[in-house]
């Protein structure tokens, strides 16, 4: 590539040198020419004389010398300044400008043509069926049905496919106003003219049963108005709670994980005047957890660890103050029916009466034995002792087995000795 700036600079330097040489040559030539000034003619009379001689056609040596000097200067000027190069450089500078002008014109025309072609192609695609929605998919919904989400979003088939993701904000606000369970909405263009409506909902914490229908309770403390005829999720059923207590319970249970929440089958309100906010949780593995609403979320975090230590046993896990295990019976089971509790209480009362009767008999027998052990006079004590020793001998002799005697005979002799002693 030619560096045009350097070449132009060299061209200027050469031209300046040539101009200087021309000025020197012209100044030397002017010194030889005659002057019209009369003062100068008086000061230099010899030149006037020479001029007169020239006019008269007389030969002059100085004129010949001047002509020779002019020829020498002209030859030197030809050697130092090359007129061919000067002309060529001028042509090159002009050709450079023409090339730049041609390049700029060609690029501008090319850009305009490309932009015009792009507008034509884009307009054709925008109006063609390739820019129309063919399929709409819904994902992430567990509470709101798919048909309601499609209808509420306002999306329809044959709508413009290009730029559909920019409508996410409009669809998100529309679905949030229609359905309180919707947390956020995202539109995704999946290709092949398919649009995905990705819905994120608030988690359902449990259900409330009213007139054979179930109403979901969300983690954002909202109970939905839409009823369902059956339980379709692994979440507990809330029984016996007022609205304020229900919101308080939902706030606490929202802190539990999905796995732990799925292990709870039912939550019952067992509070009274002495124990407000008292609840019982019926677990899927057969255990029953008793505690308070305010602290149940923190203490249920250790439920799996407690169950692993029980080694398969089931019962009542009390989490009111600390945590301890009890064997389950109808009296400490909040989910037992009144009939079961009454029958179990009757059995307990009967067992208590029997134990009391046994205790009374034992006390009576001990009192009689104490009365029989009162001290007697010495004569009576000696006679009694002799009778006791003799009777003991007889019983020992009778109780000793003899050959040919059976067990029935031995038992009869033992009873006879007991009667004689009495």
Curated annotation (Swiss-Prot):
Residue ranges in the Cytoplasmic topological domain are 1-109
Span list, region Disordered: 1-77, 329-422
* Location of the protein in the cell: Cell membrane
In this chain, composition skew of type Basic and acidic residues spans 1-23, 62-75, 338-379
The keyword Cell cycle belongs to this UniProt entry's keyword annotation: yes
Q: Which PROSITE patterns match?
A: POTRA
Gene Ontology CC: cell division site; plasma membrane
**Pfam families from the UniProt entry:** POTRA_1
- Provide this UniProt record's keywords sorted from A to Z: Cell cycle, Cell division, Cell membrane, Membrane, Transmembrane, Transmembrane helix
Q: Where is the composition biased (Low complexity)?
A: 389-422
Q: How does it sit in the membrane?
A: Single-pass type II membrane protein
Instruction: Give the protein's function.
Output: Cell division protein that may be involved in stabilizing or promoting the assembly of the division complex.
Q: PANTHER family of this UniProt entry?
A: CELL DIVISION PROTEIN DIVIB, CELL DIVISION PROTEIN FTSQ
What is the protein name given in its UniProt record?
Answer: Cell division protein DivIB
Where does this protein come from, organism-wise? Aerococcus urinae (strain CCUG 59500 / ACS-120-V-Col10a)
> What gene makes this protein?
divIB
